């Protein structure tokens, strides 16, 4: 049983993808199960549409997901050039909304046979994406936190007040879409260890 999830706002396009996949699965006598979008992390293959805020640091999760799941990007052809500056997304298979049925079917055969991406996306590829929206001071703060410094120590090292440092930390957390300090520290530990080598 192949579990598939599609996160796409255009319901007509999503329905079209499901028809193509169902037809192919029937030809191969392969059973597929379409999961709801909120269960995308449990799917074997996930189709992810680029939303309006895809420029954010959200793509840092791609290397982690591709260790156990094939991810494919749904986007417009005009996004292709922008994707070149997001190597973690550019490495994934793409389905363009402008593709005709024949082209989507051709791409889908590779995706469903899991030949579209041979290896997981390496975690090092995301360094630029993850930190591109941070100021120099924010990067410095992240590096100090990743090194294990407490807030009061980082404030002193950055020549800032504790209140300014807290404000800076909140700004970083917003950019990373994390809400609690525990999530923030876990995020740094899991995704930003590369800061220590800089």
Swiss-Prot record:
Keywords (A to Z) from UniProt: DNA-binding, Fimbrium, Transcription, Transcription regulation
Signal peptide: none
Main location, first listed in the record: other
Gene3D superfamilies recorded: Winged helix-like DNA-binding domain superfamily/Winged helix DNA-binding domain (1.10.10.10)
Gene Ontology cellular-component annotations: pilus
GO BP annotations, alphabetical order: regulation of DNA-templated transcription
PROSITE patterns per record: HTH_LUXR_2
A GO MF term: DNA binding
Residue ranges occupied by any HTH luxR-type domain in the UniProt entry: 127-192
Superkingdom: Bacteria
Record keyword Cell division present: no
Location in the cell: Fimbrium
NCBIfam families tied to this protein: PRK15201.1 (NF011748)
Name of this chain's protein: Fimbriae W protein
